[in-house]
Amino acid sequence: MYWGGSLADNKSLRINGSIRVREVRLVDAVGQQCGVVPTPEALRMARDINLDLVEVAPQASPPVCKILDYGKYRFEMGKKLRDSKKRQRLQTLKEVRMQPKINDHDMAFKAKHIQRFLDEGDKVKVTIRFRGRELAHTDLGFNVLQNVLGRLVCGYSVEKQAAMEGRSMSMTLTPKSKK
């Protein structure tokens, strides 16, 4: 039976003596419904098998209570919460910068990094920075971006096409969703 600990972390659940209604709809330890039972009798049934009476649906009329091990129940709920937080990964924006006069090996290296970022589930912003008179040859930057796209393995989609932004040209790639 659950004896200690504060319920400050889980105020919505009432257990054992803190259930203050006259009668409850009872679900026993195996999951079978026992019907509407007076609260003192439900508490006695829970104590007889050395478990707790936990109010799982206080909004229902009458409230639904279940006979279970409260410590184990809290552990399972915490485990579910941790697992859901673990799976909930935020998508971040990574930026890879290049110049229009990029060497072939350097481009392959950058393309490999872009592919890794996409495989990890991140968005990637590919930026070509123009310096000085390179700004007159924006077509070279566009060719570099097309070359990078050609080197990538499928598994991405272009969110924002190549466009000039001041002295740089950028394009945003997103990973395709895994279904």
Curated annotation (Swiss-Prot):
What's the encoding gene here? infC
Where primarily located? cytoplasm
Kindly give the Gene3D superfamilies that the UniProt entry links to this protein: Translation initiation factor 3 (IF-3), C-terminal domain, Translation initiation factor 3 (IF-3), N-terminal domain
Q: Its family?
A: Belongs to the IF-3 family.
> Cross-referenced PROSITE patterns, in alphabetical order?
IF3
- Do you know which InterPro entries this protein is assigned to? T_IF-3_C_sf, T_IF-3_N_sf, Translation_initiation_fac3_CS, Translation_initiation_fac_3, Translation_initiation_fac_3_C, Translation_initiation_fac_3_N
The subcellular location is:
Cytoplasm
What protein name applies here?
A: Translation initiation factor IF-3
What keywords appear on the UniProt entry?
Cytoplasm, Initiation factor, Protein biosynthesis
- Biological processes per GO annotation: ribosome disassembly
Q: Does the keyword Cytoplasm apply?
A: yes
One CC-aspect GO term: membrane
PANTHER family this protein is in? TRANSLATION INITIATION FACTOR IF-3, TRANSLATION INITIATION FACTOR IF-3, MITOCHONDRIAL
Which species? Answer: Treponema pallidum (strain Nichols)
Share what the entry says about its subunit structure, partners included: Monomer.
State what this protein does: IF-3 binds to the 30S ribosomal subunit and shifts the equilibrium between 70S ribosomes and their 50S and 30S subunits in favor of the free subunits, thus enhancing the availability of 30S subunits on which protein synthesis initiation begins.
A GO molecular function for this record? translation initiation factor activity
The cross-references to HAMAP family, in alphabetical order and at most eight, read: IF_3
